[in-house]
Amino acid sequence: MISRVWILWTLVLFLLVTESHCIQKSSLSKNWGPQSMLYLKGKHGRRFVPDIDDHFISNSGLKSWYAVFK
């Protein structure tokens, strides 16, 4: 009975070590170039809420959702 438990734990340990090495090889870091960054930004560019500027809001006429989304 003790030998079966020892074999089982050895097998589990071996599988965990093997699996951990496989995961590290598959998660390679990528170097994002400028073209890739443009693709990731999408059609509308960066998405941020600008500082509150009354001149910007009054000239644009977009006081609702567009100002929030941009």
Swiss-Prot record:
MF annotations from Gene Ontology: neuropeptide hormone activity
Keyword terms, alphabetized: Hormone, Secreted, Signal
Domain of life: Eukaryota
Pfam families: Spexin
Main location: secreted
Localisation: Secreted
GO cellular component, one term: extracellular region
Record has Oxidoreductase as a keyword: no
Propeptide residues according to the Swiss-Prot or TrEMBL record: 23-30, 45-70
Leader peptide range in chain numbering: 1-22
Similarity comment text for this entry: Belongs to the spexin family.
The protein's name in its UniProt record: Spexin prohormone 2
